């Protein structure tokens, strides 16, 4: 893990010019997601951390855009590709060709992708917002609830006739409860939808700074931010790889079971095919008894053939006369009795 970056407090009055001259210097850190954004009077201030940044309205009007001071972990996604890259388009291109930007013509609703509870130095929750400036260009900014509240206060001053409702604060219960955070995420998403529904509000300076429309995040905003984001990606990648290995093991087990079942089905089909090719109609009766399989086979054609042979042999045999047989037996018995009487 990278060593936490500790911001150094800077005086606002003496160092304002140095911050204004170098527009690429940003003083956000991984522990202070919510740095300040410009108010309607032109002064930036952040009450959450010690880092501060000061510009004035005249400089912002001269440069036709302002510095986005709040995003912590920021990256840019191109299209639907999962590869990550940062915005490298120069500001001059955007200033010289304002027609190429379609945010003014057709603003897209920023999407809150989720939230994360940070515990680097002070525990707080950040919400990840996906901003789409065009179908080919989008990026992610991280905002705290206080950033939304500060933006809402600015919009009330700039547009008194509009009232954009924010989810209420929670004073006495746990602010890190999962159900509470999910409900707050839905409320913040509704806030963003109502915000971009009005063209004047969606294109005002405060909203453009909040979403970094004029200054898309780059790769060199903060070294600590880049390190923290890379560590988050590494941890996510590790968990995804473990989940992938578990799924692969499950797939291999199912493939093995499927192969065994297929072999059993093939064996049954082979046996059925063999029985259908045997001559004659054979009747098989299988019954499991005492752990053994008893097989009884009877051939109807063989039985019929044996019956016909026995009938034909019976036609050629001499007929037997029961009367003659009875007289012969009587003669033998009489002779035997006479012989026995002579012996006596």
Curated annotation (Swiss-Prot):
GO terms for molecular function: identical protein binding; phosphatidylinositol binding. Residues 27-40 have a biased composition (Low complexity). Residues 1-10 have a biased composition (Pro residues). Residues 223-278 form a coiled coil. InterPro entries: PX_dom, PX_dom_sf, SNX16_PX, SortingNexin/PXDomain-PKLike. The keyword Protein transport applies. It is found in: Early endosome membrane; Late endosome membrane; Cytoplasm; Lysosome. Its main location: membrane. One of its GO terms (cellular component) is lysosome. A 1,2-diacyl-sn-glycero-3-phospho-(1D-myo-inositol-3-phosphate) binds at residues 144, 146, 184. Residues 1-49, 83-105 are annotated as: Disordered. Residues 88-105 have a biased composition (Basic and acidic residues). Homooligomer. Interacts with EGFR. May be involved in several stages of intracellular trafficking. Plays a role in protein transport from early to late endosomes. Plays a role in protein transport to the lysosome. Promotes degradation of EGFR after EGF signaling. This is Sorting nexin-16. It comes from Rattus norvegicus. The gene is Snx16.
